[in-house]
Structure formats: structure tokens, C-alpha cells
């Protein structure tokens, strides 16, 4: 019985010594951030209203007036899941455009370019062919995805009008013979923006 008691006492002393605090302590911490990719256009719908552009003289053509140009802003939030490689993109495509017409697009990244990268992250750059600071010729939108913004890192643009990237749309007539009147209704097309990494 004495031997069992001595072993128990020795074990208690050793365990007691190893559980004591010291002058230095470390603690592990964990951080969990979910990857996310969100994109938004400030106006869910833009209407190109040409009802005031009817010709007033017989033999004159219907021509698109000042409403052929519209603009809005694109906002996004992106948290990369690939170790921080700034390879995010936003692509654009169009579907169901009015027959006889097409849409061109330019983007101005100046508002996003003024944001502090320490606060907003690694914001993307407008692809050169879409960049309104480099060209005045818009890119014709098609039903195939085209890269609009590239090299996006973990970042966000701010929300609402005046934040992010200004989008500059222009409507054009392709084939006059395919145009038709809507008599107060509107043909609806869809422009789709997709953010990926």
C-alpha cells in the first residue's frame, strides 16, 4: 500500500509542476473568412426611350437621339479563395437585343482608381478595349462573355451611384429593315455581368 501511495504522490507532484503558469504564455487563434463574389449594377433597368425621335417630314429617317447614350455604375465585392492571386474578372454579355440594333459599352475606372488600396483592396483594371480613358469607340456587346474588368484582388468598390466603375452604353442601328415600333411597350434585352476568380 505504501508503494501505491508513493507512486500516486510522485505523479501528483509531476502533474502539478507541469500545469503551473510561466512568465510567457502563447495562445493559438484562428480566423475564418468565407470567399465571396458579388456584382451589382446600380440601375436594374435602363430604358432607351426613342419615342421623341420620330421623323417630322415624309421621307426622313428615324434616327436615334440623345437618349442613345445612357450610363450607370458597376459595384462589386470579391474575397479570393486562391491565396491572394489577383486574377478575378468581371465579364459582360448581352441577350435579346432589339432586332436591327446593337449596344456598345465603355467603362471608366477612374472612380475606383482613386480608392486607397489599404482600405479597399486590390481593385481591378478596365480591359484596354473597354477603357473609356483610352478610347471613345465602344465595344459591341454580343451573347459571348467578354472580359470587362481584370486583375481583381480581394477588394470592394463601395455601393451605389458614383462608386466603382462607370458604365457608358450607346445604342446603335444595325439594320433599319429589322426595326419595329413598340407602340408604348418596350422590347427587353438583358445585359449580364459575371464576376469570377
Regions found by a protein language model. Name each.
Residues 2-8:
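Sec-dependent signal peptide recognition
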Residues 10-18:
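Hydrophobic h-region of N-terminal signal peptides that target proteins for export
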